[in-house]
């Protein structure tokens, strides 16, 4: 491992005999024969996670941020975490957080702003404690700002806590700081790939590259074209088409990495940390032109500096504040354009074999930065491994997806019932719109990155295949749980105002589930879904219309037939089994949804118009009676409808009887016209 930067408190762990400022990479191996997996840097402390799950810390310890009683440059193990297998660590200015392989979070250090999430406000916590508020969640990611934290759960729920002076918690206006994790409901339904915290600003990244930012924006670090703080997540529209796959935040600047290896930066630029050959702030995302000839695979931001790794050459480039040696260029001055970090670097597949000086070269594995320090995991040529690629999302770190592999695992968990937590986790994921929305992405030529009000970005064929697999008898226990989850949680919780188009894919996915076509589930699934669709606000409703116009005719016809079937089902005797208000709401929902589909079909001609016919209606509904009842309502006579209803029915019955008698006697049309109650006299009788 190599490290460089500011070490006045020993936080880089290089040793007390070295200078306060380390301006170029120094080899560092604090634990021989032990592999470091991750490094997190706080304001003046560092946390090291080993491959075996142990955690070591060093640096300043005034608030207990090291989790043990020692202080200084020598890393010491946190004994309180020895019984846990830690898989991820993060640091704030003076606090630390660790994530276990069981999805539990532990925090310690400064807590005066609630940043530890322990419910109580404490100035300093010297021993790691479990964040109990998240005990029912399986946490996958955690990120720390200076005095706040963000956490992403497996079911897509997103939590924040700590200081909220600038709205960095995303909980809305006038919300005070929070000492316990709070759910950010405004991102519900969006399948998230990453959460990232800056000094006092926050970001969330969706699986399809949508970027949402909020919090402090005094330097334009949210990329929203202004310098106004935001209290709730806001879509960074200028990045929507860039296929963003990773975000890193400094104190007041932000860097994003695209799938093609491009780097965009925005926010504070006073130290050159944006890499635009200037010291100006940028309120809009702007590509780092100096890196355009290279494909970048890793980025990392410190307090006021930025790093980028180019795998083809093995080089690390740095720019921004260098007064504390944090750029590793060998100098202590600010740099406003990407500059090579000093050292012997080589690509993983570089041609070093046989060279006499091959042992001098370092092969980068992973770069880390924070505060005024930088760490690089690397290896010698003969033992080198490919560098990590931040553009390849680690599936264990983002919103859980439903696929062949996961349904087999969940089926086994439900069969064993060895833990109520295991069952609860399955239920949470199956009930999550975010999990379903991210599960069937159209990955062919990255089509899902084009998700928009006109393009859903999902592969409905893969949806159908997975659902058909679930219908096999071997998955019956899981199927039962899915049905319960849809009925009790997922459909009732669908919002009338989804936060983004990515949260709307669920409306295309659910009708593909075979039980929706089964009349046994019309009341519990099919019709509630129709009601949820009809509750959508104007804009999301138009988005769904656009998406329906893009689907294949076969899918569209199934949807039409589904709700035609629901209408027939309701009219076939269900009126007497349901209370009137329920029957009325269900039949109205089915018919209005068919009307909505018909309007779409008029524009795109998915199916012939006669596919909307419901022939059974003529035998299930007395059209004449129904029409006259409707006519009276329309004429403003609703108040007397009930009084005349029985007379109306008697007259209609009388007309039918007389009509039958007339036909039996083979009377001519003139005689039929004179029969009391016939159509020519009906309005007169009513008068």
Q: What spans do the regions from the language model cover?
A:
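Conserved loop/turn at the beginning of each blade in beta-propeller domains
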Residues: 18, 32, 40, 82, ...
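Conserved beta-strand position repeated across blades of beta-propeller domains
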Residues: 40, 48, 79, 90, ...
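Blade-level signature of beta-propeller repeat domains, shared across WD40, Kelch, NHL, RCC1
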Residues: 315, 321, 331-346, 351-398
């Amino acid at each position: 491992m190599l490290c460089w930067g500011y070490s006045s408190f020993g936080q880089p762990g290089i040793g007390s005999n070295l200078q306060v400022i380390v301006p170029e990479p120094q080899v560092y191996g604090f634990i021989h024969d032990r592999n470091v997996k991750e490094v997190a840097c706080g304001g003046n402390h560092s946390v090291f996670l080993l491959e075996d799950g142990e955690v070591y810390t060093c640096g300043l310890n005034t608030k207990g941020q090291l989790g043990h009683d020692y202080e200084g440059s020598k890393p010491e193990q946190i004994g309180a975490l020895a019984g846990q297998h830690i898989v991820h660590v993060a640091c704030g200015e003076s606090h630390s957080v660790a994530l276990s392989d069981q999805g539990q979070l532990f925090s310690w250090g400064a807590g005066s702003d609630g940043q530890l999430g322990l419910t109580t406000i404490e100035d300093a916590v010297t021993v790691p404690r479990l964040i109990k508020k998240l005990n029912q969640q399986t946490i996958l990611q955690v990120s720390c700002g200076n005095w706040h934290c963000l956490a992403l759960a497996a079911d897509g729920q997103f939590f924040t806590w700590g200081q909220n002076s600038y709205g960095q918690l995303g909980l809305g206006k006038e919300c005070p700081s929070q000492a316990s994790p709070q759910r950010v409901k405004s991102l519900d339904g969006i399948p998230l790939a990453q959460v990232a915290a800056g000094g006092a600003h926050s970001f969330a990244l969706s699986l399809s590259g949508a970027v949402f930012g909020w919090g402090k924006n005094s330097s334009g670090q949210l990329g929203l074209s202004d310098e106004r703080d935001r209290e709730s997540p806001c879509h960074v529209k200028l990045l929507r088409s860039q296929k963003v796959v990773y975000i890193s935040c400094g104190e007041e600047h932000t860097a994003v990495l695209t799938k093609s290896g491009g780097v965009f930066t925005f926010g504070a630029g006073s130290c050159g940390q944006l890499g635009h050959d200037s010291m100006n702030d940028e309120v809009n995302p702007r590509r780092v032109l100096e890196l355009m000839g290279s494909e970048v695979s890793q980025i990392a931001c410190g307090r006021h500096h930025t790093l980028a790794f180019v795998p083809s050459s093995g080089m690390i480039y740095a720019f921004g504040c260098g007064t504390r040696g944090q750029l590793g260029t060998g100098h202590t001055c600010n740099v406003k354009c990407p500059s090579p970090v000093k050292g012997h670097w080589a690509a993983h597949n570089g041609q070093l074999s046989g060279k006499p000086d091959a042992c001098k070269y370092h092969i980068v594995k992973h770069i880390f930065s924070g505060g005024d320090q930088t760490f690089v995991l690397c290896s010698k040529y003969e033992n080198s491994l490919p560098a990590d690629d931040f553009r390849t999302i680690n599936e264990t770190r983002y919103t859980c997806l439903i696929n062949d592999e996961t349904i087999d695992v969940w089926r086994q968990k439900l069969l064993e019932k060895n833990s109520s937590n295991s069952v609860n986790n399955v239920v949470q994921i199956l009930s999550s719109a975010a999990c379903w929305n991210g599960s069937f992405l159209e990955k062919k030529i990255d089509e899902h990155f084009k998700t928009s009000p006109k393009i859903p970005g999902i592969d409905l064929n893969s949806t159908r295949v997975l659902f058909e697999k679930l219908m096999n008898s071997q998955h019956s226990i899981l199927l039962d749980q899915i049905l319960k989850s849809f009925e009790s949680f997922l459909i009732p919780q669908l919002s009338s105002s989804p936060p983004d188009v990515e949260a709307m894919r669920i409306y295309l996915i659910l009708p593909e589930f075979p039980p929706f076509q089964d009349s046994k589930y019309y009341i519990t699934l099919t019709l509630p879904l129709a009601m949820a669709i009809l509750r959508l606000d104007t804009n999301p409703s138009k988005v769904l219309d656009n998406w329906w116009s893009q689907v294949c005719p076969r899918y569209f016809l199934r949807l039409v037939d589904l709700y035609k079937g629901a209408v027939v089902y309701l009219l076939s005797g269900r009126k007497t089994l349901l209370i009137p208000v329920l029957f009325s709401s269900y039949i109205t929902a089915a018919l209005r949804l068919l009307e909505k589909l018909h309007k779409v079909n008029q524009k795109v001609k998915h199916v012939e118009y006669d596919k909307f016919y419901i022939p059974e209606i003529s035998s299930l509904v007395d059209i004449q009676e129904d029409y006259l009842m409707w006519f009276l309502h329309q004429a403003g006579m609703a108040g007397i409808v009930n009084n005349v209803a029985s007379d109306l029915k008697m007259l209609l019955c009388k007309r039918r009887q007389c009509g039958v008698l007339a036909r039996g006697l083979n009377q001519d049309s003139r005689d039929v016209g004179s029969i009391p109650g016939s159509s020519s006299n009906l309005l007169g009788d009513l008068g």
